[in-house]
């Protein structure tokens, strides 16, 4: 299990959407149990892969690169071909995927903290990912005037929420499916607008959905 932290939940107990996950650090910090300085130091040492030189040549990381990132590279090429605005947003998606990789590397070199995941230390390590997710979402908001690509931007903005699986336990797979459904709403609009007009846009939708499906398969396997 490589999930890094518990997700926030909605009032009905269901998994929170990514906009909520992007703020998980604040919620986790507010609700975190008080730890002694010794306990905090122990938990930090178990998670501290970002400031130490650790090997990323482990099966779970290689699988991420070979399975998920290879699909992302194909998506990135197709997205850049659509235009500079889309290219800029998909690069932000890539940065978010890199932050997930960093967490996977950290998790592969430590055991789950005995004090649990709902601590300020874990929230600290989730912060870069939360920032990356927020960047993708804010990019869409900053480009609402993009008539041609607004549905594309929204597809990525909604789908990026799926990376919040690292903050979901015990079953992150279904969470990815829920976020894919949110992205599908806008993806269907892209298909409706461009089917029979410009198939490259339709193919782009398929590529992004393939990324989400591949990531879910990775999570369910590892």
PLM feature segments, named:
Residues 1-131:
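Generic N-terminal leader/targeting and pre-domain segments
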Residues 2-5, 107, 136, 170, ...:
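Generic recognition of well-structured, leucine-rich alpha-helical segments
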Residues 49-60, 81-92, 117, 121-124, ...:
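Non-transmembrane, amphipathic alpha-helical segments
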Residues 73, 77-80, 98, 105, ...:
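Generic surface-pattern signal
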Residues 97-100, 126-133, 160, 180, ...:
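Short amphipathic alpha-helical coiled-coil/interface segments
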Residues 134-139, 157-168:
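Short, charged/polar, low-complexity loop and linker segments
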Residues 155-157, 182:
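Mid-membrane cores of alpha-helical transmembrane segments in multi-pass membrane proteins
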Residues 165-222:
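Extended, domain-scale alpha-helical bundle/helix-rich regions
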């Amino acid at each position: 299990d490589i999930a890094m932290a518990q997700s926030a939940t909605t009032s009905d107990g269901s998994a929170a959407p990514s906009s909520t996950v992007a703020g998980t650090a604040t919620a986790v910090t507010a609700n975190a149990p008080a730890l002694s300085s010794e306990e905090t130091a122990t938990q930090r040492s178990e998670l501290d892969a970002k400031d130490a030189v650790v090997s990323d040549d482990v099966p779970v990381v290689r699988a991420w690169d070979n399975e998920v990132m290879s699909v992302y590279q194909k998506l990135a090429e197709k997205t850049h071909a659509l235009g500079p605005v889309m290219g800029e947003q998909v690069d932000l998606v890539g940065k978010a995927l890199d932050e997930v990789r960093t967490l996977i590397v950290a998790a592969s070199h430590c055991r789950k903290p005995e004090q649990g995941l709902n601590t300020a230390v874990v929230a600290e390590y989730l912060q870069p990912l939360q920032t990356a997710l927020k960047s993708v979402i804010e990019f869409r908001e900053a480009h609402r005037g993009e008539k041609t690509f607004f549905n594309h931007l929204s597809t990525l903005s909604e789908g990026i929420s799926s990376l919040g699986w690292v903050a979901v336990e015990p079953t992150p797979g279904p969470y990815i499916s829920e976020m894919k459904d949110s992205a599908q709403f806008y993806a269907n609009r892209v298909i409706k607008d461009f089917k029979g007009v410009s198939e490259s846009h339709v193919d782009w939708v398929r590529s992004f959905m393939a990324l989400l499906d591949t990531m879910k398969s990775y999570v369910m396997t590892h």
